Amino acid sequence: MIGYLIYPATTPRTNNAFSWFCDAAMQNGIELKVFFYNSPQVEEQFKQAPLPDFVFLRGYHIPLAQWYESQGIKVINTSESMILCRDKFLTFQKLDELGIPTPQTLAPFLPSPKENHTPSFEECSAKLSTPFILKQLYGSKGENVYLIDFPESYRQALEQCHAEHLRRIGEKSLNSEFGTTEEEIERGSMVIAQQYISFSRGRDTRVWVCEGKVIGHILRYNENSFKSNFAQGGSFKETELPENGADRAIAAAQALGLSFAGVDLLYLENGDFSVCEVNGNPGFRTAKTDIPQGIFRNLKI
């Protein structure tokens, strides 16, 4: 069996994950070939190459995923599931629709402090209470996420999100993380106001799920910030995952149709968990278990 592991061209070639994936695949009888994409279009290198048995896409190149799907090739993750999990409001809607606990989230809007369509601080706090979270629709690693407790912090966060919006549009690089068209980039630059779960301040549990099974989990924490992300200075350590936490993570991944996912669980006072975000392209450097092995042992091709 042959699979293609496809990364954005911006990925450092020194990334150890390449060998981790390839070694784990080989141990499970799979030959994995590594490719890189450098364009928002489906490049000729993929159209001319022999079709693999499956594609493992380490990025958000939706057109490439759709092209392989049109050829009858299994893509991990599917284009539909990646569209859902990349957009934090679509994620909220799907989880909420299925009754999976997740922070209350208001409809997205453009981050322009001077526009009439931007809700005021008072409007957001009336619906979500204060403090609340402000974040952009597309993004990861805790970037462009703000804790809002006063009108001034709201104004400053909107200005920073607006600057990020202009940067994404102005660069016209069409980075697949933020979209492959200007319309997608515009959508991804919109912001959402979200309920803040104060009981879980600075800590969450990242759960890696593959084909409906938990293959790893880790407690992430930060004593100096409300963000627990490792990329934002957080730390990590092993922890036990209660059955209800595993159930929440599996349900969230399945709700979005993800074969492989990283699910971030917030702690609730009643001992339950709330799904903060679901990542269809999760890293796993902080994992204490062999995530690639877990993937290829459980993957259904």
Language model segments and positions:
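Short glycine-enriched loops at secondary-structure junctions
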Residues: 60-62, 81, 213-214, 220, ...
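Active-site nucleotide/adenylate-binding loops and adjacent lid/helix of ATP-dependent enzymes
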Residues: 4-7, 82-191
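A conserved acidic, glycine/proline-rich C-terminal tail/linker
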Residues: 249-253
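Conserved N-proximal alpha/beta basic substrate-recognition cap immediately N-terminal to
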Residues: 6-113
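Protein kinase-like catalytic core scaffold
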Residues: 132, 215-216, 261, 274
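C-terminal active-site "lid" helix and adjoining low-complexity regulatory extension at the edge
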Residues: 236-240, 254-258, 267-301
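Conserved protein-kinase catalytic-loop segment immediately C-terminal to the catalytic Asp
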Residues: 133, 208, 266-268
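Phosphate-binding site of ATP-dependent enzymes
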Residues: 143, 147-248
